[in-house]
Regions:
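An amphipathic, hydrophobic-aromatic interaction surface with interspersed Lys/Arg
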Residues: 1-202, 207-224
Length: 224
């Protein structure tokens, strides 16, 4: 990071908030806490416009998030992208109206000149939220682990499931897309558990179920 590129009070405040999540004092300089539930960059000012990001709430031991299913899927699919695509990721996360993928692409030009440090901070925040969802909550069974240098294919599976749920009668595609992401993941989790149970009941062994679902045998045993 180059300190001279950090300009403006808002940029410094956001960086300070994110620094609380970075473990660097007397420890490995490269170790970052990228697994937490918090919205550390709730607003972003670009020119004369104020953009509000998604919200995360954990009151009463209940997790909610304002992101819609399609909004989360689009943003998750961009994690690990090149710096040039970060304005699109930010446009998705800070979209001001009813979300559409097309609208986010149009809005992305608004964020092209935003300080790269801020764009990366927003990306880190969303990455940490996603990591928490798929490693520290009941949604961990949706996280398909591959080799360490292979990005999990969950975003592809989630996108396909939009149409599967619509075909199952849960509503048209637009209704499913606008569903709150936590509700959407809850349905996917339920469907996956039902599939594992059904495969077990027809006599498939654990290895076969693992091959078909991508779940570890340990996870399958926990479900059954």
């Amino acid at each position: 990071m180059e300190p001279q590129k950090i300009k403006g009070i808002t940029a410094r405040e956001n960086l300070y908030l994110l620094s609380a999540q970075i473990d660097f004092i007397f420890k490995d300089m490269n170790v970052i806490n990228n697994c937490f539930l918090a919205q550390l960059v709730p607003t972003l000012i670009v020119g004369n416009r104020l953009f509000s990001s998604y919200t995360i709430h954990t009151d009463f031991e209940t997790l909610t998030c304002s992101l819609t299913a399609i909004q989360f899927i689009d943003a998750y699919g961009l994690l690990g992208c090149s710096v040039e695509k970060l304005p699109l990721l930010v446009a998705i996360l800070y979209y001001p109206e009813k979300y559409t993928s097309e609208g986010a692409h149009m809005l992305s030009q608004t964020f092209v000149d935003v300080d790269p440090v801020i764009l990366q901070a927003i990306t880190l925040n969303f990455q940490a939220f996603s990591n928490y969802l798929f490693t520290r909550t009941r949604f961990n069974i949706l996280y398909l682990k591959k080799s360490k240098d292979h990005k999990p294919s969950i975003s592809i599976g989630m996108a396909e499931s939009l149409y599967n749920l619509s075909a199952d009668g849960l509503g048209d595609v637009d209704v499913i897309e606008q569903m709150p992401v936590i509700k959407y993941l809850t349905i996917l989790r339920k469907k996956l558990i039902e599939s594992v149970t059904a495969m077990n009941e027809v006599g498939l062994d654990l290895v076969e179920i693992s091959d078909k679902t991508g779940l570890s045998i340990k996870m399958i045993k926990m479900i059954l």
